[in-house]
Design a protein with these regions (language model features):
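Amphipathic alpha-helical dimerization/coiled-coil segments
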Residues: 90-117
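A short, conserved structural fragment
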Residues: 66-76
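Short alpha-helical segments that sit at the start of domains
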Residues: 2-29
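Short amphipathic alpha-helical segments
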Residues: 25-29, 41-42, 59
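Short amphipathic alpha-helical interaction segments
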Residues: 51-67
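Short acidic, hydrophobic short linear motifs in intrinsically disordered regions
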Residues: 37-48
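Short helix-to-turn junction characteristic of helix-turn-helix DNA-binding domains
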Residues: 31-35
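Short, cationic-aromatic polyanion-contact patches
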Residues: 17-23, 76-99
């Protein structure tokens, strides 16, 4: 897979990532590396090293990312949600491609962390 992305798109992606706080950026990077896999709120909290409860993460950060159409959330049961990056977002699609091509080692680390639960 070859990324055929112009400089303007790469610049926009950098600007988008720079505009996010550390937690939101960590979430998007983790989800981009494990795409197309989805994770629960608890799994996501562990992946990014979030020390609070996944419920507080959901109320603030995750809901903001969902409102901005950066992530997609599917409700599997009343208390279990599947969270994944929105690969249809034009800039996040580029991020997913970058992570897929250049982030194989990091992807392996994330997937190993998910297996260790």
């Amino acid at each position: 897979m070859v990324i055929d992305t112009d400089d303007a798109t790469m610049y926009e992606l950098i600007q988008l990532m720079a505009s996010l706080n550390d937690t939101r950026r960590a979430i998007l990077l983790a989800l981009a590396h494990i795409y197309p896999r989805s994770v629960s709120g608890v799994q996501l909290s562990r992946l990014i090293g979030y020390s609070g409860k996944s419920r507080s993460l959901y109320r603030g950060v995750i809901s903001h990312l969902q409102e901005n159409e950066m992530i997609q959330i599917d409700q599997l049961t009343p208390k279990l949600y599947a969270i994944r990056i929105n690969n249809e977002h034009p800039l996040l699609n580029v991020l997913v491609d970058l992570c897929r091509i250049h982030g194989k080692h990091t992807r392996g680390m994330y997937l190993k962390a998910l297996e260790e639960e």
